[in-house]
Curated annotation (Swiss-Prot):
Taxonomic path: Bacteria, Bacillati, Cyanobacteriota, Cyanophyceae, Oscillatoriophycideae
Organism encoding this protein: Gloeothece citriformis (strain PCC 7424) (Cyanothece sp. (strain PCC 7424))
Signal peptide: none
Pfam families reported for this sequence: AnmK
Function per UniProt: Catalyzes the specific phosphorylation of 1,6-anhydro-N-acetylmuramic acid (anhMurNAc) with the simultaneous cleavage of the 1,6-anhydro ring, generating MurNAc-6-P. Is required for the utilization of anhMurNAc either imported from the medium or derived from its own cell wall murein, and thus plays a role in cell wall recycling.
Alphabetized Gene3D superfamilies for the sequence: 3.30.420.40
Stated family: Belongs to the anhydro-N-acetylmuramic acid kinase family.
Pathway terms, separated by semicolons: Amino-sugar metabolism; 1,6-anhydro-N-acetylmuramate degradation; Cell wall biogenesis; peptidoglycan recycling
GO MF term set: ATP binding; kinase activity; phosphotransferase activity, alcohol group as acceptor
Gene (UniProt): anmK
Stated name of the protein: Anhydro-N-acetylmuramic acid kinase
A Gene Ontology BP annotation from the UniProt entry: peptidoglycan turnover
């Protein structure tokens, strides 16, 4: 079955689209990437999404308009990705997160008022209507209803795409926010029950915001990490910035621009100004914060350090970040990209939501891992929207 996965993360770079051919059932799947592309948001829409994600209030009319505008962009991405390719029969659309609130109390101890909440805009109903293709959306809310974080949702797919027979691996996504999937070797007894995952902290978000600030909006990211590579990180500042409750919170945990956005960057910027750091040192320090937060999470919360760390997401192209991660991990872990083991790192999350949609509609197979999200039980993820021709 040809399926389209659509994803836009906290970087709000645009909509990642993946057209994949999926066959099989449940965990016995064959997945082939046919095409992948990223379709940038119109600049004004991107700015509005970022503002709302960081707490700017909207009227109900404005929220509805934003919801429809995002859905339209997702539908256009689905239409574009399949041009020249076989007709897709299913779309899995994550939508655009504009608000994420983790649950207040650990699983088993909460009341209904303590449940988390996560809002993704880009209604599946609109995507179905514009494309004529069945669409699965709203993947996170079922896990949240069962007491989970609603995130991360990629680990179950990671486990069957990227686990190794004998090697312990971490799949480290570096989007706007960083998240890790810990994969024990498949030769370990009951290995699936020892797959873990959580958000590690800032990925690219602070680096990108800093580049925009330093260039007055002329640039949106540091290509290949070349600017930061010219600088020297301030270890004193990195140590100070790491004294943030989220980094020491045990999993399950998730975060977003609510914690690591403009407000957090402004604090970092004030610290850098006090030390008279040049721009390249400031950027190098923010890269070091991402690296240090990843390694802190590994050492504090993993059962053991991984033999390999596989990077994906936009940050996998930041060669300076990759270098610093390898230098800080030392010889105990080899840092690679998922591309180097056969999975396109730019579209891995889009592929994930195609698989989650396939599991939901075709297999009626749970897509979450309770030990990852903190949910009380496995859940079917996503709402199914059918075109009128299939009702």
């Amino acid at each position: 079955m040809y399926c389209i996965g659509l994803m836009s993360g906290t970087s709000v770079d645009g909509i990642d689209a993946a057209l994949v051919n999926i066959s099989g059932k449940d965990l016995d799947l064959h997945i082939e990437l046919i095409a992948g592309a990223t379709y940038p948001y119109p600049p004004a829409l991107r700015e509005k999404i970022i503002a709302v994600s960081e707490g700017v209030s909207l009227s109900m009319v404005e929220l509805a308009q934003l919801d429809d505008a995002i859905a339209t962009q997702f539908a256009l991405a689905a239409q574009k990705i399949q041009k020249g390719h076989p007709q897709a029969e299913l779309i899995g659309s994550h939508g655009q997160t504009i608000y994420h609130r983790p649950p207040k109390i650990k699983r088993g101890e909460f009341s209904q008022t303590d449940l988390g909440y996560s809002l993704q805009l880009g209604r599946g109903e609109v995507i179905t209507d514009l494309t004529g293709i069945p669409t699965v959306s709203k993947f996170r809310i079922a896990d949240i209803a069962a007491g989970g974080q609603g995130a991360p949702l990629v680990p179950k797919v990671d486990a069957y795409l990227l686990s190794h027979p004998t090697q312990t691996r971490c799949i480290q996504n570096i989007g706007g926010i960083g998240n890790v999937t810990y994969l024990p070797p498949r030769n370990q007894e009951n290995w699936e029950s020892h797959v873990y995952g959580w958000d590690t902290g800032p990925g690219n978000v602070l680096i990108d915001l800093a580049v925009q600030k330093l260039t007055n909006g002329q640039k949106t990211y540091d290509e290949n990490g070349e600017w930061a590579a010219q600088g020297k990180p301030s270890q004193d500042l990195v140590t100070k910035w790491l004294q943030y409750d989220f980094f020491y919170q045990a999993p399950p945990k998730s975060t977003g621009r609510e914690l690591f956005g403009h407000e957090y960057l402004d604090k970092c910027w004030t610290d850098a100004i006090a030390l008279q750091l040049p721009p390249e040192d400031f950027l190098a320090s923010l890269v070091e914060l991402t690296v240090a937060s990843i390694i802190h999470n590994y050492r504090a919360f993993l059962p053991q350090m991984p033999q390999a760390v596989l990077l994906c997401g936009g940050g996998s192209h930041n060669l300076y970040l990759k270098q610093r991660l390898q230098e800080n991990l030392g010889h105990q872990s080899q840092v690679l990209t998922t591309d180097e083991v056969g999975i396109n790192g730019d579209y891995k999350e889009a592929i994930t939501f195609a698989v989650l949609a396939y599991w939901r509609k075709i297999c009626s197979f749970p897509g979450n891992l309770p030990q990852v999200t903190g949910a009380s039980k496995p859940m079917l993820l996503g709402d199914i929207h059918l075109p009128i021709s299939q009702i």
